[in-house]
Amino acid sequence: MKYLLDLILLLPLLIVFCIESFIKRLIPKKKKSVAGEIVLITGAGHGIGRLTAYEFAKLNTKLVLWDINKNGIEETAAKCRKLGAQVHPFVVDCSQREEIYSAVRKVKEEVGDVSILVNNAGVVYTADLFATQDPQIEKTFEVNVLAHFWTTKAFLPAMMKNNHGHVVTVASAAGHTVVPFLLAYCSSKFAAVGFHRALTDELAALGCTGVRTSCLCPNFINTGFIKNPSTNLGPTLEPEEVVEHLMHGILTNQKMIFVPGSIALLTVLERVFPERFLDVLKRRINVKFDAVVGYKDK
């Protein structure tokens, strides 16, 4: 009874905060300056990571770029230098914890303390559970979520000491709603979203108000990781569009960045609608892609 009474007493606050949130959405947010910041981006040799590096290069930042692909990271670095940025590329396998820690030491010695960390590196395997090999499952979690722990543990202390910084988690819409034949990927992205949310609350509990967090959750992106993805939610997203939303979210300290915005509505529907209706809804959304190993379409 006391719990119910407490909830009723909180209703006026809920109404006030809802109105406040609505008004804030109508007012354009001022973008913060990131000039002079040291920005580290993992998975910067291609796709979202590469384009994010280009955008930060235009903003007078110092870039630290990581990728497992030497040619890819050098190409990104060359373009960023043409855009006027100081760039430090490193070949790093984000599935290897000790390799990450070794690179961290080099970054601190050669460049300095990272103040904006973009955990972007990711892998995906399209297969049913039984066709997904054990090493593939392990690598999915090592890159898609465990690497976030190792990099954040390494660079967050300096941000907390200065009460200034930003940790960016590149997750996925698959971190909120599941897709068949992406079991390992969805599980790892749910973990990445959980990492972001728990880190956000932990920083708040510690009083680190100057250390910001953001989490990107896009729908399918045309980067070649998944072959011919399609959904009735709309066309496959182009990387440039996603990065535009990501940069706006970072520069305005947005905590959760959904692309498209309708993904946010889906996450709410999954929690309140009956399961049978959700089954019908998922059939209407009709997520499809090629090259599913182990599954035979009947």
Swiss-Prot record:
Its EC number is 1.1.1.62. It catalyses: 17beta-estradiol + NAD(+) = estrone + NADH + H(+); 17beta-estradiol + NADP(+) = estrone + NADPH + H(+). The active site is at 185 (proton acceptor). It comes from the Eukaryota. Keywords: Endoplasmic reticulum, Lipid biosynthesis, Lipid droplet, Lipid metabolism, NADP, Oxidoreductase, Signal, Steroid biosynthesis. Pfam families: adh_short. This is Estradiol 17-beta-dehydrogenase 11. It comes from Rattus norvegicus. The gene is Hsd17b11.
